[in-house]
């Protein structure tokens, strides 16, 4: 979840590294550091600072350093607190080796203990520093650097990406990758290194993604690539256009606010894209037509917001194309009893395509030679490269940690895919698929209009009132329950207000004890008459206990509106698309609450955008 950026070449490194880190700060912002080799004597020059990247930039302004070979790091803490000592780079005893690292070294305690017995002195609590000390020892005991690296990689366990500078090899950088992304941008007599190619925007479109379990020795004009056992690997360079401009705020106060308003166009773009690949969709997602037609079970796997999108999509696949569908949290899926089924497909959902738990679940299913599909927003991601096939959401770059437009485009893509599968199975005709596409365009308009229907001053006034509460309860039934889960997560993520979500039918099985006037209860309504009446009954129970009720209702649902302290009314649309229609207003309301509380909305505490460690 940390950001790594490096440079080696004809120019000085600091400007590129700092610009790159600013683009990758979403990966972590507990501390930051920069190191380079002094062009005069090849000694390390470095600065580290706890807190946001701005603190490091300030230190570098006060104490300028630079060199032609340099690297930087923005950290999300997994081992050790946010402090100058724990910030990267980390060094060996003699400060001849510097390392920046993303991931987790699972056996770092054993390595540290062994090296301490041998006389090594450690200065941090990180799992990174032991790598530098171990490499120091191995270089001394091997005749070649390559042999030392192979020995190092045989000794460390976990998932990691590392960039390493060595004073005695001052014209190159060592890169190591195991189950954590790392790539090289190839320039003219210069090389750019990053954990996300977003850092390369405006510099190069020639990109080499390090294969899993590989290491590279990189000079300004040469790349030597090897597997962990020292066998040379081919250089598979891709041409990828990266546009950083779409990631700018463009006048909005926060990235999250911009991305909320991006959703209409993102859904429009999704429909245009999905229409364009409709005739070749099964090639795209790695299924044969025959397999798609005979599909008997679908499994959806994701984490966080992507898991909520999967929970919503379960209703699509079961009701539209009549395929039994299971949904699993990726972090739990790998440890469950598993029964492979051949006429099945596994869809892995991740905005970044780098989510560690989801990737490991994908690799587990790949190892069983079952059909895997990646649904992601990033075409250059690891999931795209490793799945049998993929489907790209058309959200555009999402910068805010709290997902907005990635969530809505995931729902749109899965809704369309369910209809396309139903067409393949002969359950619907092409006209019905086209109607579903039009329905998505309609709901995109509703999503945006629902925000405008509640003028900003009204929402701001309501946000000021609801920001005073310390906790909240969210309820839903059927397809509105997973949407309630997402709403509760959004409130927790960006406002830090404690929020708990339950299926409304479970209210009497414990949660009713939490109801009081100081705990607002949010209910997300449903179009089905039976489910709606059950929600009305839940609302009555809450009011009978002096609960404060906020309802997201549909036009004409007067009975539940009459019970509410606050109502948000949505137009009636296709029942399965109600959660998507409610998405924009829900996000905007929660955003305003967080703004009222003066929270760092784009970068909430303790969270990172791309969760690349388990």
Regions found by a protein language model. Name each.
Residues 68-85, 270-289, 313-349, 355, ...:
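Glycine-rich oxoanion-binding loops at beta->alpha junctions
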Residues 1-249, 253, 265-296, 335, ...:
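Conserved short alpha-helical segments that host acidic/polar catalytic motifs at enzyme active sites
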Residues 293-442, 477, 524-571, 589, ...:
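Glycine-rich phosphate-binding loops that contact phosphosugars or nucleotide phosphates
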Residues 263-299, 389-520, 531, 597-614:
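Active-site phosphate/pyrophosphate-binding segments
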Residues 548, 563, 573-614:
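Generic C-terminus detector
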Residues 159-190, 466-493, 529-531, 536:
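Acidic/histidine-rich
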């Amino acid at each position: 979840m940390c950001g790594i950026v490096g440079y080696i070449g004809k120019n000085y490194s600091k400007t590129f590294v700092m610009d790159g880190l600013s683009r990758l700060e979403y990966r972590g912002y507990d501390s930051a550091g920069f190191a380079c080799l002094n062009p005069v004597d090849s000694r390390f020059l470095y600065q580290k600072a706890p807190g946001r990247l701005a603190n490091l930039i300030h230190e570098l302004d006060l104490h300028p350093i630079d060199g032609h070979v340099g690297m930087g790091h923005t950290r999300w803490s997994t081992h050790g607190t946010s402090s100058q000592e724990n910030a990267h780079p980390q060094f060996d005893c003699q400060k001849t080796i510097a390392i920046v690292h993303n991931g987790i070294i699972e056996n770092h305690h054993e390595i540290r203990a062994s090296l301490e017995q041998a006389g090594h002195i450690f200065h941090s609590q990180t799992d990174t520093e032991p790598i530098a000390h171990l490499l120091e020892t191995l270089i001394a005991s091997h005749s070649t650097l390559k042999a030392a690296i192979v020995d190092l990689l045989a000794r460390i366990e976990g998932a990691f990406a590392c960039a390493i500078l060595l004073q005695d090899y001052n014209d190159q950088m060592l890169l190591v990758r195991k189950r954590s992304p790392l790539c090289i941008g190839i320039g003219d007599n210069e090389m750019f290194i990053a954990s996300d190619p977003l850092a390369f925007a405006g510099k190069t479109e020639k990109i080499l993604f390090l294969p899993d379990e590989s290491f590279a020795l990189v000079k300004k004009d040469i790349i030597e690539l090897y597997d962990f056992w020292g066998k040379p690997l081919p250089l598979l360079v891709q041409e990828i256009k990266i546009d950083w401009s779409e990631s700018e705020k463009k006048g909005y106060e926060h990235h999250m606010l911009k991305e909320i308003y991006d959703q209409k166009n993102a859904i429009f773009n999704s429909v245009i894209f999905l229409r364009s690949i409709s005739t070749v969709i099964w090639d795209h997602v790695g299924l044969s037509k025959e397999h798609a037609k005979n599909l008997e079970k679908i499994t959806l796997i994701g984490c966080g917001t992507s898991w909520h999108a999967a929970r919503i999509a379960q209703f699509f696949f079961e009701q539209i194309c009549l395929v039994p569908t299971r949904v699993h949290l990726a972090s739990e899926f790998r440890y469950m009893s598993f029964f492979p089924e051949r006429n099945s497909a596994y869809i892995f959902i991740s905005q970044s395509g780098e989510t560690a738990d989801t990737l490991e679940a994908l690799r587990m299913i790949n190892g069983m030679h079952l059909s895997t599909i990646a649904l992601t927003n990033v075409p250059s991601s690891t999931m795209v490269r490793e799945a049998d096939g993929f489907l790209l959401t058309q959200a555009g770059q999402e910068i805010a940690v709290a997902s907005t437009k990635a969530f809505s485009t995931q729902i749109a893509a899965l809704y369309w895919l369910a209809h396309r599968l139903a067409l393949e199975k002969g359950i619907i005709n092409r006209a019905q698929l086209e109607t579903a596409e039009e329905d998505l365009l309609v709901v995109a308009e509703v999503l945006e209009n629902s925000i405008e229907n509640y003028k900003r001053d009204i929402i701001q006034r309501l946000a000021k009132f609801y920001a005073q509460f310390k906790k909240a309860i969210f309820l839903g039934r059927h397809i509105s329950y997973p949407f309630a889960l997402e709403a509760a997560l959004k409130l927790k993520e960006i406002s830090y207000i404690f929020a708990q979500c339950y299926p409304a039918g479970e209210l009497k099985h414990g949660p009713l004890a939490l109801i009081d006037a100081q705990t607002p209860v949010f209910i997300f309504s449903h179009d089905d008459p039976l489910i709606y009446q059950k929600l009305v009954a839940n609302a009555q129970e809450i009011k009978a206990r002096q609960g404060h009720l906020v309802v997201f209702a549909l036009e004409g649902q007067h009975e539940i509106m009459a019970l509410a302290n606050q109502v948000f009314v949505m137009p009636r649309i296709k029942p399965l698309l109600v959660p998507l229609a409610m998405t924009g207003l829900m996000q905007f309301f929660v955003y305003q609450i967080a703004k009222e509380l003066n929270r760092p909305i784009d970068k909430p505490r303790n969270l990172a955008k791309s969760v690349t460690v388990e």
